[in-house]
């Protein structure tokens, strides 16, 4: 079985990361959560009170405190800036609400895309984000564009937040997700869009395992 690159793109809370992790584990591939990298950059900007116009200061911070990944004893992904574990802080609402603005900064995207491409050279990889199939891995053997209704995505995020002990209002989440969809698909740099050769998959009404099986079937055709 040959190793391939699998790119999974889609809007916020469409289930990309959950599905990508399972597929990577099943195939023995590396999983890279690119969204966590943009969240880490956003966390750094907020922590240091940097506005979107203070690009040089943010890039300098990212050089001083590089983003890296690790594994917990239970196999869960950990995210670090420098040697500080920021796995949980990057999932807080303040980061979620600002990440689109930071991710739209061309120099930040350029820096992180370069790092993502470097990691992808290591072999079989599953990467999820907004522009993986169009910008980061345009040569990926399998590209998936994952979507779901705003209501369903808000429900998923609501349940995730409750499980993590994060206080959340469902109606607010719906508005935030719709607003983020607009920002992500209308930004000038690497907007969210489906690659021409991507497989379109609407996950509304499907459970995680059903989505995983559909993507694995597509992957196996290419191996």
From Swiss-Prot:
Broad enzyme group: transferase
Binding residues annotated for ATP, in chain numbering: 10-18
Native source organism of the sequence: Streptococcus pneumoniae serotype 4 (strain ATCC BAA-334 / TIGR4)
Gene: cmk
Listed InterPro entries: Cytidylate_kin, Cytidylate_kinase_dom, P-loop_NTPase
CDD domains membership: CMPK (cd02020)
GO-annotated molecular function: ATP binding; CMP kinase activity; dCMP kinase activity
The protein, known as: Cytidylate kinase
Similarity remark: Belongs to the cytidylate kinase family. Type 1 subfamily.
GO biological process: nucleobase-containing small molecule interconversion; pyrimidine nucleotide metabolic process
């Amino acid at each position: 079985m040959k190793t391939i690159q699998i790119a999974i793109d889609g809007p916020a809370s469409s289930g990309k990361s959950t599905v990508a992790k399972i597929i990577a584990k099943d195939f023995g591939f590396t999983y890279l959560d690119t969204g966590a990298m943009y969240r880490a950059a956003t966390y750094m900007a907020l922590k240091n009170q940097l506005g979107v116009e203070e690009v040089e200061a943010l890039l300098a911070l990212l050089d001083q405190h590089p983003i890296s990944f690790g594994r917990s004893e239970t196999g869960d992904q950990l995210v670090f800036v420098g040697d500080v574990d920021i796995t949980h802080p990057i999932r807080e609402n303040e980061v979620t609400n600002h990440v689109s603005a930071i991710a739209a900064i061309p120099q930040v995207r350029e820096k992180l895309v370069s790092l993502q491409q470097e990691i992808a050279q290591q072999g079989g990889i599953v990467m999820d984000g907004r522009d993986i199939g169009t910008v980061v891995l345009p040569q990926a053997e399998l590209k998936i564009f994952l979507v779901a209704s705003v209501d369903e995505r808000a429900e998923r995020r609501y349940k995730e937040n409750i499980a993590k002990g994060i206080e959340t209002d469902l109606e607010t989440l719906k508005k935030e997700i719709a607003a983020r969809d607009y920002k992500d698909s209308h930004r000038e740099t690497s907007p969210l869009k489906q690659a021409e050769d991507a497989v379109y998959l609407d996950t509304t009404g499907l459970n995680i395992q059903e989505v995983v099986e559909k993507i694995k079937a597509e992957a196996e055709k290419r191996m």
